[in-house]
Swiss-Prot record:
<dbReference type="InterPro" id="IPR000529">
    <property type="entry name" value="Ribosomal_bS6"/>
</dbReference>
<keyword id="KW-0699">rRNA-binding</keyword>
<comment type="function">
    <text>Binds together with bS18 to 16S ribosomal RNA.</text>
</comment>
<comment type="similarity">
    <text>Belongs to the bacterial ribosomal protein bS6 family.</text>
</comment>
<keyword id="KW-0689">Ribosomal protein</keyword>
<dbReference type="GO" id="GO:0070181">
    <property type="term" value="F:small ribosomal subunit rRNA binding"/>
</dbReference>
<protein>
    <recommendedName>
        <fullName>Small ribosomal subunit protein bS6</fullName>
    </recommendedName>
</protein>
<dbReference type="Pfam" id="PF01250">
    <property type="entry name" value="Ribosomal_S6"/>
</dbReference>
<dbReference type="GO" id="GO:0006412">
    <property type="term" value="P:translation"/>
</dbReference>
<keyword id="KW-0694">RNA-binding</keyword>
<dbReference type="GO" id="GO:0003735">
    <property type="term" value="F:structural constituent of ribosome"/>
</dbReference>
<dbReference type="GO" id="GO:0005840">
    <property type="term" value="C:ribosome"/>
</dbReference>
<dbReference type="InterPro" id="IPR035980">
    <property type="entry name" value="Ribosomal_bS6_sf"/>
</dbReference>
<keyword id="KW-0687">Ribonucleoprotein</keyword>
<dbReference type="InterPro" id="IPR020814">
    <property type="entry name" value="Ribosomal_S6_plastid/chlpt"/>
</dbReference>
<dbReference type="InterPro" id="IPR014717">
    <property type="entry name" value="Transl_elong_EF1B/ribsomal_bS6"/>
</dbReference>
<dbReference type="GO" id="GO:1990904">
    <property type="term" value="C:ribonucleoprotein complex"/>
</dbReference>
Length: 101
């Protein structure tokens, strides 16, 4: 199992109260494969540096989770198929890379 950090930008048209349930639905991919969701941090509505899909704002969220590499790939695939998700980025935190060497 490896630690990952996911940053996701959701369409600003998603209701604020629907953000957490929407993310938890996506994160079921991780929990079904015996992974764990360590932290879910919703930053809220922020201005984008440049327009994405003709939108100048997005709802940012950061999720720390532990899973197998193929589970992280599947999560990225599931997120990319959803229209409410504007951008995603999954990385392994720097600290983990240093300790892994």
């Amino acid at each position: 199992m490896r630690e990952y950090e996911l940053m996701v930008i959701l369409n600003p048209e998603v209701e604020e109260r629907a953000v957490e349930p929407t993310l938890k639905k996506f994160l079921e991919v991780v929990t079904k494969e015996n992974g764990t969701v360590d932290k879910l941090d919703i930053w809220g509505r922020r201005r984008l540096a440049y327009e994405i899909q003709k939108k100048s704002e997005g709802i940012y969220a950061v999720v720390n989770f532990t899973a197998e590499p193929q589970t992280a790939k599947e999560l990225d695939r599931v997120l990319s198929l959803n229209e409410a998700v504007m951008r995603t980025k999954i990385i392994r935190p720097e600290e983990q890379k240093i300790h892994g060497k």
